[in-house]
């Protein structure tokens, strides 16, 4: 595991770059970025440049902030809890979150927090839970805009046919996370 740092300026938005090389069933999860503002985590994302640029710009604009290097208690706690999660010793997180997005996106992300560890829901099922069964595409779009992956478990949303679809970290990473949370684990 390699930890590399990054942070914020006009407000105090800290970004911390983390490399988790997790070997699970011969697969890897790659560099992730963590960021916080006002002692709340606002970013835990995959280092996929095109996706990250969009999310970074949205967060910077809404929070009127820019990045600079550093670390905080929130980042340290998040790293510890993610390490426990990847080791199979944590099923929930108690990190304070700052959800940065539209009201609709925040509604979707808050509902994602209700999906239990080891369980999945379809986009159609999620849209029904939110009381808007015709909003499947809008809900999928909000799910894809989630800036706090893993802690806000967008990876637990799957297609109605139970197939893995759409994930900011890529489908191989989504499969690794779902396998990690599966009750059928071999270790």
Where are these predicted regions, by residue range?
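Terminal helix-turn-helix DNA-binding modules in bacterial transcription factors
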Residues: 145-149
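Pre-recognition alpha-helix immediately N-terminal to the DNA-recognition helix
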Residues: 107-111, 138, 176
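Basic nucleic-acid-binding alpha-helical/helix-turn surface characteristic of O6-alkylguanine DNA
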Residues: 4-133, 184-187
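Major-groove recognition helix of helix-turn-helix-like DNA-binding domains
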Residues: 139-144
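…primarily DNA-binding HTH/wHTH and HhH modules…
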Residues: 160-187
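Short Lys/Arg-enriched helix C-cap and helix-to-coil transition segments
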Residues: 150-157
């Amino acid at each position: 595991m390699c930890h590399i740092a990054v942070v914020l300026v006009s407000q105090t938005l800290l970004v911390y770059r983390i490399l988790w090389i997790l070997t699970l069933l011969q697969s890897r999860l790659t560099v992730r970025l963590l960021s916080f503002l006002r002692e709340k985590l606002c970013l835990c994302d995959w280092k996929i440049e095109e996706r990250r640029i969009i999310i970074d710009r949205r967060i910077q604009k809404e929070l009127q902030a820019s990045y600079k290097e550093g670390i905080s208690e929130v980042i340290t706690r998040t790293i510890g809890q993610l390490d426990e999660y990847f080791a199979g010793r944590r099923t929930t997180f108690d990190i304070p979150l700052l959800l940065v997005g539209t009201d609709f996106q925040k509604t979707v992300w808050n509902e994602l927090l209700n999906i239990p560890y080891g369980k999945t829901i379809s986009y159609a099922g999620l849209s029904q839970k939110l009381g808007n069964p015709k909003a499947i595409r809008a809900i999928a779009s909000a799910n894809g805009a989630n800036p706090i992956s893993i802690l806000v478990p967008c990876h637990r949303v799957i297609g109605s046919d139970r197939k893995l679809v759409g994930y900011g970290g890529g489908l191989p990473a989504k499969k690794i996370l779902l396998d990690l949370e599966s009750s059928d684990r071999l270790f």
